[in-house]
Amino acid sequence: MASSLMSNAATTMAAATTTAQANMVAPFNGLKSISAFPVTRKNNDITSVASNGGRVQCMVWPPLGMKKFETLSYLPPLSEESLLKEVQYLLNNGWVPCLEFEPTHGFVYREHGNTPGYYDGRYWTMWKLPMFGCTDPSQVVAELEEAKKAYPEAFIRIIGFDNVRQVQCVSFIAYKPASYGA
């Protein structure tokens, strides 16, 4: 009997505690003052965004005699080892290597007016056929050497073509003529 009295007392006390907790809600004191929140001020000064240890300097690329075009054209001429690595990248992605050359204009140019057009030097002549089934980068470099001998004054580029999606995925200049000078 003593145990049943204790359990009844414990049950009554637990019920009273949960009822009291359910009825306790913090009173609404109104909106908080904005001065209670930390404020960060935005600085509209451009020099605070970029820092090179002092003042910000900009470089202007000389526009005359230093035309740049295509991917990798800002780099020095690629060595044979670098070319082999680039072609291996194409092959690893499942793209078909293809060579194109342009004997007169290596740049986009306006041939038929001063507004952009469809044939503004974007289309080059294909060297032979795309190299479907090629698995060795040295085959592509050998074709590049053959194209250089046939057209020593032409720009030659290597293209990675995705024959499933029917798109050109990558293109870079592999050879610039000696007369170009840069």
Curated annotation (Swiss-Prot):
It is found in: Plastid, Chloroplast. One of its GO terms (cellular component) is chloroplast. The keyword Plastid applies. One of its GO terms (biological process) is photorespiration. CDD domains: RuBisCO_small. Belongs to the RuBisCO small chain family. RuBisCO catalyzes two reactions: the carboxylation of D-ribulose 1,5-bisphosphate, the primary event in carbon dioxide fixation, as well as the oxidative fragmentation of the pentose substrate. Both reactions occur simultaneously and in competition at the same active site. Although the small subunit is not catalytic it is essential for maximal activity. This is Ribulose bisphosphate carboxylase small subunit, chloroplastic 5. The lineage of its organism: Eukaryota, Viridiplantae, Streptophyta, Embryophyta, Tracheophyta.
